[in-house]
Regions:
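Short glycine-rich or small-residue beta-strand-to-loop segments that form or flank ligand, phosphate
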Residues: 24-31, 47-50, 76-85, 92-95, ...
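Single conserved hydrophobic/aromatic residue that forms the stacking wall/gate
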Residues: 1-5, 9
Length: 166
């Protein structure tokens, strides 16, 4: 394990203040290769755990399940997934398993890239840099003591109304 602003485990970067978290926590996932995304956004008021895959590849669901279990401090976990095929597959499989485990998790998907598809066809839009302000907004709501449902609602409203172009 490496220490700094975040602790680094095999494929997880963990906010080193997570152990003291008395709030909703935020977990995200993504492939490596575009640093500082996604692991570079771990820190106070942002992401609590980032799960990294190989270069340009999503991590497996088991790593995400372990991260969610580690992040869960009794207030629930917001699971942010960017709309890319591998990330979505991992995100959906992860959600299926954490629900079976009885964990309180809500998934929010970023799919804001308007270069791919119009708003009416959001499922075909990629999640890109819009995740960064979403992490900050959700992190601020969590830090303010909002419930998981409230944090997720704020994050979802932002996700539904943002657009980027790449």
């Amino acid at each position: 394990m490496s220490r700094g602003l975040g602790d680094v485990y095999k494929r997880q970067v963990v906010n080193n203040k997570l152990k003291d978290a008395d709030r909703v926590t935020i977990v995200t996932l993504g492939g490596t290769g575009h640093e500082p995304a996604i692991s570079g956004f771990v820190g106070e008021g942002m992401v609590d755990i980032s799960v990294a895959g190989n270069v340009f590849a999503a991590p497996g669901p088991q790593a995400c399940i372990e991260a969610i279990k580690m992040a869960d401090k009794g207030h629930g976990v917001l699971f942010v997934v960017l709309n890319h095929a591998g990330d979505m597959l991992t995100g959906n499989l992860t959600m299926k398993q954490v629900k079976k485990l009885g964990l309180n998790v809500i998934k929010v998907v970023t799919q804001e890239d308007i270069a791919n598809a119009p708003r009416s066809n959001a499922d075909d839009r990629r999640g890109l840099v819009g995740c960064v302000p979403l992490y900050k907004i959700a992190g601020a709501a969590a830090a303010a003591g909002k419930s998981l449902e409230e944090v997720a609602a704020v994050a979802q409203k932002f996700a539904d109304n943002m657009a980027t172009i790449a």
